[in-house]
Design a protein with these regions (language model features):
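Nucleic-acid endonuclease domains
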Residues: 1-84, 89-151
Length: 151
């Protein structure tokens, strides 16, 4: 795998790299990834990978695609931020245009899972929720029911 194009310890570097996503589709990201990282995905895997991440019933699939194909790290269920050395949590979420032309979130945004049995014993400032939510890189994309393929 080639060297990362951003400094994973620096929030500004991560944000600047993320800015390069503006104007790209998820398919663009996948194609760029497979073009330069061909040793990781062979063509048959690319089709299966794309189909799996395009699945509308799979919540988080497009976020996983951004994590793996753009930022080049494997998705995980770690309670730490996605970029632990920079303290940055990455979230990819859809927005929609309402009938009255206003914008709204298409779905709720989940930062982390909370253990309701343990949370009462935690100090908020020491919690993994606080650790994850201090610095969030929010990448949003337009959802439209008219678009059949999310990629």
């Amino acid at each position: 795998m080639s060297a990362k194009l951003y400094d994973e310890t620096n929030p500004i570097s991560i944000e600047n790299y993320a800015q390069k996503l503006i104007g790209k589709t998820f398919n663009d990201v996948l194609n760029d990834y497979t073009k330069y990282e061909s040793e990781l995905l062979i063509s048959e895997e690319k089709e299966e990978y794309a189909e799996n991440h395009e699945n509308k019933k799979r919540k988080g699939g497009l976020g996983d695609l951004i994590e793996e194909c753009y930022f080049h790290y494997k998705c995980n269920n770690d309670s730490r931020p996605d970029f632990p050395d920079a303290g940055v949590e990455l979230k990819v979420t859809p927005y929609k245009i309402n009938k009255n032309k206003t914008l709204s979130a298409k779905e709720r945004l989940i930062i982390t899972m909370i253990d309701y049995f343990k949370v009462v014993e935690e100090n908020f400032e020491d919690s993994h929720l606080w650790n994850k939510s201090q610095l969030i890189l929010l990448i949003y994309y337009l959802y439209s029911k008219d678009i059949k393929n999310r990629l």
